[in-house]
């Protein structure tokens, strides 16, 4: 077991709003204070504008001419987003922009007049704001219909986001921007025989950009060391990030639209732990701003807003990165604060709303309460009427009508909520109906631990939800008892250590849960076990994925846009991970705060994510790529530099086999549920199932980079398919050998169907099922929402492909069992429309050949010739088959003994549904809560292999041109010198232009620089070289394994040519290179961190369910180990003396 002195996490922190207070609009602004010298970047000259700058015209940055923008973004006028602390490593202020002090107060008189909802005019004509609406003959139902049809413009003068519903806004239009079409066109230089037709290829505008972007050097090999340092200096945050813009404090703004600056409430280790601070690194100032990228708003909501999560990345001045994960929960404002907010709202109502508008809001509240009462009465009648009877159907229709009316009235009331009381009896949860967010987060230096941190944070905030997360067994001495938050924090940040390699996995416990932190082995792609790529592939089509990859290879300015911050985090990290072996070396900001939007004008490559709800989003004038993750679109100012034709077609072909979730399994496009909120459908489900399992999935990289294209669709053996985890606590019982599960209440609660965020999230609709509405009490609360959303009585058509025949074993022709050593399959042209039944018919298992059927010998069939002629067949829901998130559920009417994987309840006598791929079982009522992809519908390991195979084909001969360095190069520490010109000339004719483009990119220069400076046997260098060797081996013919005496002898001595996977089903004779197939270091021996336990003062439930703004040091215990090194307790006079540990508790700040 390795020893480590690196903690598993550097810091735990809490951020939120310090106090809800509204300054007097008549008060004078604070006098201007010059910017202190501490925020001036080290080594940079004095900034001139700090002594005489012009104030901004509004809260957000306004459009300026190019000269002023470039002047503002110049190198000598940058602020660093890295820590701006004092010499002791800590700032005295806990605010997110503590070191930014405006010289002149901003002038808000001209900005945001229309968006603040401060119009003195009544509602627009045609809306419900007219005075005639309050007459006695007013038809309320017609008003509801009108609102449903015109809700986007309804009362737009009064609508406010307040962290809630995202209103439709004018599209961000740039006259130079165009929609990138998924069309394959010739790229690169054409051969002389094909140059007659030719093509006009648009060049990337950034090459001709008049900016300070890096300039290519013709003598890369002789000046690379210096140029790399220069480029890194240009590409760090100091070069592109301006100071945060001040908050908009317009006195006419509605109190619930007012944004508050997030502050750091507490952290561990605390500021007083000097030795620990120096060892872990200084704590950045801007963490609260990245935790709340759109700042903080008080939300008025009947229900507690949904918990969300996201990650962010911060870069310091030395180009080292800090990674953060935060989970946000919502705290109800206490009565005193809520009363103060209500007073401010009343003052605003008196000065900004007409009497008719206030009367409308009050009337809506009364009508809504009445409809809720009516719904309760109808639900009480539901169990008394037999299922299937006409009366039952009429009652269900009436219930659906009332629910629809309630939904519309709630949406109508939302913009007018400030015209009625904040709390509506019988509707509002909590004591006030006003909520403020609070963030709990982790900072660390290892990006591979981000998924682990996320699941750990979800576990520790579960008791804070006080029952909102369903199907959590009650705590007990046998099952486990919750501990105070402070003890979990010490356990993670002090007692746990970070695993160094694949020999050790670190086990952490939260009650009965066991989480395992792991690292990839040296012969695995970095991040392949820890970085999720499925979310990106669910949002974008394969054509857009490849186009995005091409933009990243060309180092474009890439801007991701989404309504969900967590989706931005997942997409940015997935894209960077797919570039392996190249590394994104430029600006990387997965979540760009709204007050730093002017960084989009940075004249250098970047990958940046912005939320759709930001106000006044202004894109650069040219040279950028806008990727809308919610709408599956890519808009750019120019076409991408396309991959070479053959490489692009083969990549697309492999991706269609590795990621068939949309083509063959009917998965909807859009962010997955786990990218929308922390607990989808109020369940502790996890997309990172391996984190909760002791056993580690086998490495498959060697298999898929050695496999021929024709065998790339081979199905996984059933014993290697890990089913998704829909309840981590239930899986913990299975891991511990416990099968009993205490029953729970509230089992019918589901995520609200309203699309208002973050109060609720609108998930993909539940599929139609033949299940009766009288299944159980679970259905009472859920099926009604399903019917209202159109989930019943409507067949959902999804697209699929005739690829589904891989559910059947391949048919063999009699008398011809082998063709040249390969199995013979039916031709694609022989697949009829009825063949779709084979997709859903394999209920009994079998994992036949997974590639496209063909009569050709598989070794002679190129992947690029298969997919263009592929026939697409629709995926249909039938009476016995339901498709949900890639799962093909078949109805098993006689199965009354299986346990539902989703709700962990036994079958109730009416049968269950079983997935033909991963074998999970579900009640009919639970199908809509299946939020995780089926492992058979998406193969992340093959997707990564497809991209790395593409890059291996582009860089196939690079090692041949690493020669001896010159004396000057040797003095710079180079071991090799790369002949760039020789490498480009050696490539095929159609790859010359693409290689010339790569020559100008920083990521390729870094790739060559690393190989010039490091020996070839270094593990990080050798891995990609071995992948290239596997590509070479794929092109060599060999005997079948079964006919080779040598292979038999090797297998008998544990040296199987297939690395333990057995011969490929597609007939491939590829041999896995020894390095890629070596599993001697794939041990992952468990090193357990002491479990937090013990008694603590105070009432148990009060302590474990609190949502503290500051950590209580009295509830902490001295760490039992320091990053894995145990502290021995003294035992009498002969006992060993306890190792001295610096006090990291500090004192509890005054509340």
Curated annotation (Swiss-Prot):
PROSITE patterns xref list: DENN, ZF_DAG_PE_2
Record protein name field: Elicitor of plant defense protein 1
Gene name tied to this protein: EPD1
Native source organism of the sequence: Gibberella zeae (strain ATCC MYA-4620 / CBS 123657 / FGSC 9075 / NRRL 31084 / PH-1)
Described purpose of this protein according to its UniProt entry: Acts as an elicitor that triggers cell death and defense responses in the host plants.
UniProt biased composition (Polar residues): 64-99, 695-711, 744-760
Every uDENN domain range: 242-500
Tree of life domain: Eukaryota
Assigned keywords, A-Z: Metal-binding, Secreted, Virulence, Zinc, Zinc-finger
Effect of deleting the gene: Enhances virulence of the pathogen towards Nicotiana benthamiana.
One GO CC term, this protein: cytoplasmic vesicle
PANTHER family membership: DENN DOMAIN-CONTAINING PROTEIN 3, DENN DOMAIN-CONTAINING PROTEIN 4
Biased composition annotated in UniProt, kind: Basic and acidic residues: 178-187, 784-798
UniProt xrefs under Pfam families: dDENN, DENN, uDENN
Subcellular location: Secreted; Host cell
Alphabetical GO biological process terms: regulation of Rab protein signal transduction
Zn finger (Phorbol-ester/DAG-type) start-end: 886-934
Family designation: Belongs to the EPD1 elicitor family.
Domain cDENN: 524-656
Biased amino acid composition, Acidic residues: 39-49
Compositionally skewed regions (Low complexity) per UniProt: 104-122
Record domain dDENN: where: 658-1019
Matches recorded under InterPro entries: C1-like_sf (IPR046349), cDENN_dom (IPR001194), dDENN_dom (IPR005112), DENN_C (IPR043153), DENN_Domain_GEFs (IPR051696), PE/DAG-bd (IPR002219), Tripartite_DENN (IPR037516), uDENN_dom (IPR005113)
GO molecular function, one term: metal ion binding
Region (Disordered): 22-130, 178-197, 236-255, 695-809
């Amino acid at each position: 077991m390795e020893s480590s002195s690196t903690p598993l996490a550097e810091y735990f922190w809490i951020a939120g709003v310090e106090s809800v207070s509204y300054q007097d609009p008549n008060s004078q602004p604070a006098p201007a204070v010059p910017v202190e010298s501490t925020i001036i970047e080290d080594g940079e000259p004095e900034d001139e504008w700090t002594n005489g700058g012009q104030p901004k015209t509004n809260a957000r940055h306004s459009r300026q001419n190019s000269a002023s923008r470039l002047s503002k973004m110049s190198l000598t006028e940058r602020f660093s987003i890295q820590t701006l602390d004092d010499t002791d490593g800590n700032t005295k202020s806990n605010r997110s922009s503590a070191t930014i002090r405006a010289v002149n107060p901003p002038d808000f008189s001209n900005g945001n007049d229309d968006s603040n909802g401060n119009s003195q005019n009544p509602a627009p004509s045609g809306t419900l704001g007219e005075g005639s609406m309050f007459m006695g003959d007013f038809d309320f139902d017609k008003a509801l219909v009108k609102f449903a049809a015109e809700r986007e413009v309804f009362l737009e003068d009064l609508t406010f986001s307040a962290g809630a519903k995202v209103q439709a806004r004018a599209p961000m239009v740039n006259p130079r921007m165009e929609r990138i079409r998924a069309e394959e066109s010739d790229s690169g230089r054409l051969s002389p025989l094909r140059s007659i037709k030719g093509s006009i290829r648009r060049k990337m505008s950034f090459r001709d950009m008049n900016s300070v972007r890096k300039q290519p050097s013709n003598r890369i090999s002789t000046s690379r060391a210096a140029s790399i340092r220069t480029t890194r200096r240009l590409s760090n945050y100091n070069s592109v990030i301006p100071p945060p813009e001040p908050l908009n404090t317009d006195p006419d703004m509605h109190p619930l639209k007012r944004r508050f600056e997030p502050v750091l409430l507490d952290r561990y280790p605390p500021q007083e732990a000097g030795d620990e601070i120096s060892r872990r690194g200084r704590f950045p100032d801007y963490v609260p701003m990245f935790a709340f990228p759109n700042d903080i708003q008080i939300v008025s909501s009947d229900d507690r807003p949904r918990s969300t999560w996201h990650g962010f990345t911060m870069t310091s001045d030395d180009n080292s990165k800090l990674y953060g994960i935060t989970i946000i929960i919502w705290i109800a404002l206490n009565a005193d604060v809520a009363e103060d907010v209500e007073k401010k709202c009343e003052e605003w109502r008196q000065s900004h709303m007409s009497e008719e508008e206030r009367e409308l809001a009050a009337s809506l509240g009364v009508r809504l309460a009445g409809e809720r009462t009516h719904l309760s009465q109808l639900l009480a009648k539901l169990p008394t009427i037999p299922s299937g009877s006409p009366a039952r159907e009429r009652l269900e229709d009436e219930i659906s009508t009332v629910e629809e009316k309630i939904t519309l009235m709630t949406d109508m009331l939302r913009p007018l909520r400030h015209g009625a009381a904040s709390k509506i009896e019988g509707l509002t949860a909590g004591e006030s109906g006003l909520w403020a967010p609070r963030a709990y987060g982790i900072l660390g230096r290892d990006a591979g631990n981000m998924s682990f941190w996320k699941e750990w944070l979800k576990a520790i905030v579960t008791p804070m939800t006080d029952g909102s997360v369903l199907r959590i067994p009650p705590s007990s001495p046998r099952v486990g008892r919750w501990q105070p938050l402070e003890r979990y924090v010490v356990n993670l940040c002090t007692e746990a250590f970070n695993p160094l390699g694949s020999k050790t996995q670190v086990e952490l416990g939260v009650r009965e849960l066991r989480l395992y932190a792991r690292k990839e082995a040296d012969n695995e792609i970095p991040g392949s076990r820890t970085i999720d790529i499925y979310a990106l592939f669910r949002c974008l089509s394969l054509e857009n994925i490849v186009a995005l990859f091409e933009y990243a290879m060309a180092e474009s300015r890439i801007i991701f846009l989404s309504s969900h911050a967590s989706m931005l985090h997942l997409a940015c990290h997935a894209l960077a991970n797919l570039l392996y072996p190249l590394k994104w070396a430029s600006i990387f900001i997965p979540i760009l705060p709204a007050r730093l939007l002017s960084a989009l004008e940075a004249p250098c490559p970047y990958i940046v994510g912005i939320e759709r709800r930001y106000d006044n989003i202004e894109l650069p004038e040219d040279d950028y790529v806008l990727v809308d993750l919610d709408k599956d679109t890519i808009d750019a100012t120019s076409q991408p530099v396309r991959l070479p034709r053959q490489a692009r077609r083969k990549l697309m072909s492999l991706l269609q086999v590795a990621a068939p979730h949309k083509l063959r399994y009917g998965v909807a496009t859009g962010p997955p549920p786990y990218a929308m909120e922390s607990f989808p459908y109020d369940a502790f489900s996890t997309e990172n199932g391996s984190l909760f399992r002791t056993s580690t999935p086998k490495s498959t990289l060697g298999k898929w980079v050695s496999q021929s294209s024709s065998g790339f669709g081979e199905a996984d053996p059933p014993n290697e398919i890990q089913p998704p985890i829909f309840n981590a606590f239930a899986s913990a019982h299975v891991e511990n050998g416990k099968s009993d599960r205490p029953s729970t209440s509230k089992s019918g609660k589901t995520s609200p169907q309203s699309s208002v965020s973050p109060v609720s999230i609108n998930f993909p609709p539940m599929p139609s099922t033949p299940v009766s509405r009288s299944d159980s009490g679970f259905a009472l609360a859920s099926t009604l929402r399903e019917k209202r959303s159109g989930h019943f009585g409507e067949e959902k058509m999804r697209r699929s492909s005739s690829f589904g025949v891989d559910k059947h074993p391949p048919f063999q022709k009699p008398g011809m069992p082998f063709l040249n050593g390969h199995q013979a399959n039916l031709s694609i042209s022989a697949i009829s429309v009825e063949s779709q039944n084979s997709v859903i018919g394999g209920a009994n298992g079998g994992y036949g050949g997974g590639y496209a059927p063909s009569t050709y010998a598989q070794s002679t069939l190129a992947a690029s010739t298969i997919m263009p002629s592929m026939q697409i067949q629709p995926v249909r829901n039938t009476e016995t088959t339901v498709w949900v998130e890639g799962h093909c559920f078949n109805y098993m009417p006689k199965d009354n003994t299986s346990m539902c994987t989703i709700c962990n309840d036994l079958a109730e006598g009416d049968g269950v549904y079983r997935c033909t791929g991963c074998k999970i079982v579900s009640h009919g009522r639970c199908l809509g809560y299946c939020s995780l992809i089926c492992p058979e519908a998406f193969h992340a390991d093959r997707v990564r292999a497809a991209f790395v195979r593409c890059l291996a084909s582009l860089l196939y001969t690079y090692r041949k041109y690493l020669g001896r360095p010159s004396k000057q190069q040797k003095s710079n520490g180079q071991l090799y010198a790369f002949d760039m010109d020789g490498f480009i000339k050696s490539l095929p004719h159609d790859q010359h232009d693409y290689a010339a483009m790569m020559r100008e990119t920083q990521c390729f220069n870094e790739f060559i620089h690393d190989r010039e400076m490091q020996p070839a046997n270094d593990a990080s260098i050798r891995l990609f070289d071995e992948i290239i060797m596997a590509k070479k081996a794929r092109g060599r013919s060999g005997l079948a394994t079964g006919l080779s005496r040598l292979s038999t002898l090797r297998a008998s001595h544990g040296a199987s040519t297939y690395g333990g996977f057995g011969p490929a089903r597609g007939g491939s004779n590829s041999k896995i290179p020894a390095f890629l197939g070596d599993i001697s270091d794939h041990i992952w021996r468990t090193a357990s961190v002491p479990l937090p336990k013990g008694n603590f003062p105070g009432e148990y439930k009060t302590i474990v369910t609190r949502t503290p703004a500051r950590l209580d040091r009295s509830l902490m215990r001295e760490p039992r180990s320091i990053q894995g090194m145990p502290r021995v307790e003294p035992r009498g006079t002969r006992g060993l003396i306890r190792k001295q540990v610096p006090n990291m508790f500090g004192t509890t700040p005054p509340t």
